[in-house]
Amino acid sequence: MKKRTLRALSATPPSIHGAFEQFQKQNEVKNLSPETIKFYSAKAKTFFLFLEDTEQCIDTITEEDVEDYILYFKEKGTVSDTTINTNLRMVRAFLYWCMERRYMERFPVRMIRADEPIKEPYTADELERLLKAPNKSTCSFAEYRNWVIVNFLLGTGCRASTLINLRIEDIDLSASTVLFRHMKARNQIVAPLTRRLGRLLEEYLGYRNETTPTDPLFVSEYGTALSRSALENAIWSYNHKRGVEKTSIHLFRHTYAKLYIQAGGDPFRLQKLLGHSDLAMTRKYVALYADDLKANYDVLNPLEQMTHNVRRDNKIKLSQ
């Protein structure tokens, strides 16, 4: 057996701020998602405000500092345990990277015990309100588009960031699939589309004029790409107009997962459909292997469950 040797700490460890800049540079080199890099930057600001002096050497941070950081949140009295752990995730990733570089002594950064919050999905009544087709002869393009978006969110379970980065060329109506390029884990997946969602997208694209394959799938009334905030505002307005107080876009993803499992879908297949890199992200479910993602998909899909009894009306042209 090869004898293990201990490496000495770096002779000149960088400052806290300098180490973090190196950490983020490495994250970009590793091709982490922009969302992950932004997350680290946002949470680092809070941590650095707590530390006050970020020009001191990184090796001055101790396990006691991390414990004091936890108490710092606790003393506020308004920060949930889940939020504390969210902040600790950045601290742990950053400090463990520094420890690997021998910038500082090793010590554990532990998450605190936290009750997992119960995220109430959209109810059947709320979904019926949201999925009810608008009057296409009188509604605005924005309302019609929002209705299609809600159908898309429930029919695919995709994230908001994935949706706003979709291009028209990502939709293959002949194959009934959608290519999700912009995923949190930086992987790309080809997900199936149900017949109903395929018909809605075909109709929606029929109302789009002078488009190119690389144009955004979902756009503003002026044909420009939707930003994250614009999408959130659109769904907030749409849901409230339909008498639904819940306005979370991500809640459609949770609703998708719940209804899918309730219909008998297996968790491993769900993991693939949601684009999770491993089963840790679907830890509520048992890992079962499945190859064919399209088998019985219309039966299992939440959108089909909620709308299978809805009569198809004749196509009505949107008013110009």
Indicate where each model-derived feature is located.
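Conserved catalytic core of the tyrosine transesterase superfamily
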Residues: 1-320
